C-alpha cells in the first residue's frame, strides 16, 4: 500500500483526532502541513483536493477522505485491529454518541474560525469571546462527563481507548490552550486523558510532537 498522506495542521483538533487514530492502528503515514495561519486551506491548490477547504484530509487507497469522524470510521473498517468501537450495537451507539458530543456539539462552537468571526465580523471583545468559549466548553464537557461515568474504566468506555477518547483528548488540549476554566469537575474525563497520554499512540499525536508544533500561536 502506498504511504497515506495526511493533510494536517499541528494544532487542529480534527487533525489531532486523525493522527491519534492512525497511530492506534499502526498506520505509517506522511504529514503535509496546511498552515491555517497563512490561509493555505483556502488556496486554489488545496481546494482542488478538498472543496471544503478544511483539515484534515487523508489520501489513502486511492481515495481523498475528509471530515475527521468519517476518516476515523474508514480507518476502523480498513484496519480493524485494534477496534475503536465496541461490537455490540448498543455499546457502539453509546461510544459514537460520546465522540459526536465532542466533535459535533463542542468543537464547532469553539472552532478557531468561529472565534475569529465573532471578533472580526461581529465586533465582539476578547473578553466576550473568551466567555463564549468557556461557556460551551463547560456545558459540553459536563454533559460528556455524565454520559461517560456509567461505562468508564481507564477510558471513557471500559479499559481500552475508543473513538470517544480519540475525540476527547484534542478537545481537552484546546480547552487548556484557550481558557483558564478549571477542568477539575470532570474526573472521568481527566482519568481517561491521563491513561491516553501514557500511550505512545496518543503522545506522538500531540501538537508539540509535530514538526510545526514548535511554533507557538500568539
PLM feature spans:
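GST-like domain detector, emphasizing the conserved glutathione-binding G-site
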Residues: 1-128
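A local structural micro-motif
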Residues: 30, 107, 184, 204-205
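Short, solvent-exposed turn/loop segments enriched in Gly/Ser/Thr/Pro and often Arg
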Residues: 35, 163, 209
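Non-catalytic alpha-helical scaffold/packing segments enriched in small hydrophobic residues
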Residues: 70, 74, 94-97, 101, ...
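GST-like fold's C-terminal all-alpha helical module
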Residues: 104-198
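Long hydrophobic alpha-helical segments typical of transmembrane helices together
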Residues: 185-218
Amino acid at each position: 500500500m502506498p504511504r497515506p498522506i495526511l493533510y494536517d495542521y499541528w494544532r487542529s483538533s480534527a487533525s489531532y483526532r486523525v493522527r491519534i487514530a492512525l497511530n492506534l492502528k499502526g498506520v505509517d503515514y506522511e504529514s503535509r502541513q496546511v498552515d491555517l495561519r497563512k490561509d493555505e486551506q483556502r488556496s486554489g491548490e488545496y481546494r482542488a483536493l478538498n472543496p471544503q477547504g478544511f483539515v484534515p484530509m487523508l489520501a489513502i487507497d486511492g481515495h481523498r477522505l475528509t471530515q475527521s469522524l468519517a476518516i476515523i470510521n474508514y480507518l476502523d473498517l480498513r484496519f480493524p485491529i485494534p477496534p475503536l468501537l465496541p461490537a455490540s450495537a448498543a455499546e457502539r451507539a453509546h461510544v459514537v454518541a460520546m465522540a459526536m458530543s465532542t466533535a459535533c456539539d463542542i468543537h464547532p462552537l469553539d472552532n478557531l474560525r468561529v472565534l475569529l468571526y465573532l471578533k472580526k465580523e461581529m465586533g465582539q471583545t476578547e473578553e466576550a469571546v473568551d466567555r463564549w468559549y468557556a461557556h460551551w466548553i463547560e456545558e459540553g464537557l459536563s454533559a460528556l462527563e455524565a454520559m461517560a461515568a456509567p461505562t468508564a474504566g481507564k477510558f471513557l468506555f471500559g479499559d481500552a481507548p475508543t473513538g470517544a477518547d480519540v475525540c476527547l483528548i484534542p478537545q481537552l488540549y484546546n480547552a487548556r490552550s484557550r481558557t483558564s476554566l478549571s477542568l477539575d469537575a470532570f474526573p472521568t474525563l481527566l482519568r481517561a486523558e491521563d491513561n491516553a497520554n501514557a500511550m505512545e499512540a496518543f503522545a506522538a499525536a500531540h501538537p508539540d510532537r509535530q514538526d510545526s508544533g514548535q511554533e507557538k500561536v500568539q
